């Protein structure tokens, strides 16, 4: 999502500031992780699916499908916002860091991310 986020931000960015990103949903999350090797994304999904399984007999919130309650739990583990420093007019992220929208539903819908820049 890094490039998509950058394309939507106003230009130029402030020399010094903070970018806050907030996703307005409860079954997806935002994360910063390695963006070079696509295997990281595959491994993260496998790890999360191992930690939080679908169709557990103790889930009570099941009316939206077997993937819904696990999606809410995964969302809570990750969080719905990120804060990224802006330095010299650029997002001050590490070489291998990228912004991820983590979709936890099996078939997620459209998602809205609110971006707020503080100078």
Language-model features and meaning:
Residues 1-119:
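Active-site histidine-anchored catalytic micro-motif
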């Amino acid at each position: 999502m890094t490039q998509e986020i950058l394309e939507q931000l106003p230009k130029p960015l402030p020399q010094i500031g903070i970018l806050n990103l907030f996703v307005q949903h409860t079954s997806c999350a935002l994360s910063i992780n390695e963006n070079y090797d696509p295997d990281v994304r595959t491994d993260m999904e496998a790890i999360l699916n191992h930690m939080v399984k679908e169709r557990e007999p103790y889930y009570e919130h099941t009316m939206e499908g077997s993937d819904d309650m696990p999606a809410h739990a995964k969302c809570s583990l990750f969080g719905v916002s990120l804060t990224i420093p802006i330095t010299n007019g650029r997002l001050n992220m590490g070489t291998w860091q990228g912004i991820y929208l983590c979709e936890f539903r099996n078939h997620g819908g459209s998602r809205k991310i609110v971006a707020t820049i503080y100078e």
